[in-house]
Amino acid sequence: MSSTLHRHIIWESDGLVAYLHPRPWTPGSVILERSTSGSPGGSIFHLQESEYLSWMLGARTVAKLLCDRLGVRRCALVSRPHRDRPAQIRVLPLHGLDAEWRPHLAGEEEYNAHDPAYCTSKSAPRWNDSSLTEIQNKIRAKLPSPDAPPNLTFLGVDPTHPGLFSRIVRGEEQQWRVWDDEGHVAFLTPFPNSPGFTVLVPRRPLTSDIFKLDKEDYEGLVLATWKVSQLLEKGLGAWGIGLIFEGFEIDYAHAKLIPLFLPPSGVEGDITTPPSPQFCATYPGYVTSEDGPEASLENLKEMHIKITLI
């Protein structure tokens, strides 16, 4: 965490503080964390459920503030656990979007068998079915009833809604489901950039702009995400789980959960060194937890005024 003297705070509430990232990957990137310094080694998924929910509601408020003040149409969320600093959420304004939703895809694929020291939403080459089934079985083995049949209830107004996620919920598409409850379904993506990359969706079509969901729908989705994160850690032996809200591959609310694994040696120093800092003035079709180049004090002050000046 940056020192208090150098933080450009844009929002504070209930023990949380949000401030401009001094090394933004995109303009106006914000870090949300506890107001007081916590112990190093933090993940939002290791918070108590009630505290986790308060963090996620805080992120929703910050996203609305950024949309209003920066004139962006939506924000993304990225949270990667850290072994050397407290838990954080990053709220990223997505610049350059059209008024109407259309798919945006990253220009390149990326796969990391072990934690590369960041989380990204980039896709990777398709896994074969047997490898996906092997991962699915590892995860489901930690369920109370691993062999229970899937619940194929679909809650959309149109019972034949044609979207991919709707068809997955109804069991009409090949899938590697790892968890479900009355309101949500979690399944492996066949294009994972990390083993066990999981997508969580509600049982009815909702906007892919998660921060604009009704409060009840938002709370339901983020609490289901917390539950699935616990399952993935236990089932796969991941040291942590990353989280991304983005919504530009499919226009249907979904959370992305990314298991992170240490190299076989278990030596943290073996983790891949992140690439050189990148800065994206407009949304490039993916988001990442990577830091960008250091922002100038003048730029941070200008951004701070734009967000906080009423």
Residue ranges and their predicted role:
Residues 1-310:
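HIT superfamily nucleotide-processing domains
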